[in-house]
């Protein structure tokens, strides 16, 4: 998977490219020989990256973006390419190839940009509020490890969907800090709204 993750593919840099299967077949289905060939490929690829810095930056930049900034995380595609026992109705066709799918992709994209910003802000608030402990930094550390792993090994946007979900608690903490922060004054504004008597209380008075 490391050999595959460091090479080009038809989909995006570092995605599935069949290298591991080819090495296994060329080695006569000998796992040890295929593994040795994979390490030879990896060393050769690392040397190439070292001699071509601009290419390396372009390769890994595209690999990161193709995995983490694909808003549907292949959730629609993975269903579309499967065989369907029943004929698709207008909803299914609209989701796969029509305006319904486009709408959800726009919605997911907006949601993910907000989540990424809020997650980064959440980490910032954890440090400035001195709330860093094993409970609060565990999920960010898991995500950091996942980022490093998928940076090097075979990539795919659906692989990182699990880690997107793990961003939500830290992002939620950011919203909590913003809503209750002294700079936004949102909490103060909401408090004043609660002090305004409603119509029923006025009639009783």
Label every PLM stretch briefly.
Residues 1-88:
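Membrane-proximal stem/loop segments at transmembrane-domain junctions that anchor or position
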Residues 52-53, 129-131, 155:
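Short coil/turn helix-boundary motifs
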Residues 60-139:
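Membrane-interface anchor segments at the N-terminal boundary of transmembrane helices
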Residues 109-113, 156-176:
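Hydrophobic/aromatic-rich transmembrane helices and adjacent perimembrane loops
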Residues 116-126, 144, 167-179:
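Transmembrane alpha-helical segments
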Residues 125-126, 142-157:
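Transmembrane-helix signature of polytopic, lipid-linked glycan biosynthesis machinery
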Residues 126-135, 171-205:
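Membrane-interface junctions at the ends of membrane-embedded or membrane-associated helices
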